Curated annotation (Swiss-Prot):
Species this chain originates from: Acanthamoeba polyphaga mimivirus (APMV)
Annotated keywords: Coiled coil, Repeat
Keyword Repeat found: yes
Family annotation (InterPro entries): T_SNARE_dom (IPR000727)
Descriptive protein name: Putative t-SNARE coiled-coil homology domain-containing protein L657
Amino acid sequence: MIIYEESASDYYNKNDRLLYGIIEIAESTIVTGSNIISDLENQGSQLQSIHYNLEHIDSDIQIANDKMDHVESCLPSVRKTARKSFKKISKKLFKKKLVSKNSRLDSGVQNSEIQNNSKIQNNSEIQDNFANNFLDNPPDNSRHFSEDNIEKLHNIVCVLEKQANDISNILDEQNNTLEIIHNKIISDEIAIKKITRRIKHTQS
């Protein structure tokens, strides 16, 4: 019976091929991480655009409030003049029997509401624990790996750690922006409803 004894060279090559396979997986993970960061940055641009548009809406609401202040300040004199004119016209029309005393004008104002159904989803994640654990707890036979591959894997892990940190920071920033947008939408809805009530009150 012939017993095959694995040479140091064969043992070295087998372990080095294993390490090279891990490196390939880690490199593909870096590409995935770059794509995630790119998508998040595009998402951030869209959120900033929404935020910018809401700032314009706030400005429009303020203008509407200022105009309503002016209208309401003029209402007493307008109503007084309107009553006098209406009495004169009513008398003339009554005499000519063109209208009845009970004629009435109804008007309605429809309220427009702001809705934001945009939802941002991101279920992608970077899994780099396998490489990190490998470097923190190397096997006893790690001396059989080539120094170049070990250094390459170490650099890849550093890149993955930076990507994970960048993604975490981007998500935190976008969560803050989303909260600001959410609060603005609620306050704008309340402001629009108040303006609508003021308009209805001036027309009553």
